[in-house]
Amino acid sequence: MAVVLALRALGLGDLLTGIPALRALRRAHPVDRIVLAAPPGLAPLARLTGAVDAVLPQPGLDRPLATEDRPSLAVNLHGRGPRSTDLLRATRPGALFAFGSGSQCPQWIDGEHEVDRWCRLLAHYGVPADPADLGLDRPAPASPAPGAVVLHPGAAAGSRRWPVDRFAAVAAALRADGHRVVASCGPSERDLAAAVGAEVVAPDLVELAALVAGAALVVCGDTGVGHLATAYGTPSVLLFGPTPPTEWGPRGGPHTVLWTGGRGDPHGDRPDPGLLRIPVAAVIDAARRAVRAPAAP
């Protein structure tokens, strides 16, 4: 069986924005084995895409791709290269799809929406992809808090973390409206979630997907949790900064994006000034307009 190897050794949001490209590869290679090189913790969600047969553990670009079989096709869904492309070349693929500087390669476009970028890459090589094909299969486990409003104060970088005391104010307002409010967190974010003043839920990745899929509303920054809301069509209020939503935000659907403009360092340690300009009142108002009605007692 031929192997198609796709590299996207990044985070949760990166995996989810890459779904249309992965599904396009699946349609183009229906009988081949699609292998995704990605962090091993993402394997359970990769399986929910319905496009991936196996995950090759690859937490970054610091080690070679440990492939057992020479791929018939290697696809760089990771970045513009050269490191990521060189890793794929080292597997000696029969063909390689990647951005590059040569006249025969598609060119990287700064500021392009992340979903569109990888769809365009594949289209250059004759593989059509649908940028709207972002849905994810629902996981088997039930939600740990069905019908709740989910606030997620964490983010991979401090520059994308809206202050936790503001999340606490939003939680208090929505709880007063009659909603069950929970604060979700990763393993290292329990103290941050506890400061929201709501019930803390610390799910694993599959449970997190179930939590978001069954939520009445998600409120978070520019994080993978927001992309889960997009994947499941869950209403969301997304607080953007310092990266603009034109590059990473949802398009259409029951999602409200708050963004005050201005770019900054998406990997910085301190909250972005633009993110700090989003007031509590605006988030509460957006949440009240977006939230599904609270469940009957």
What do the predicted segments below correspond to?
Residues 1-297:
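Catalytic machinery of carbohydrate-active enzymes
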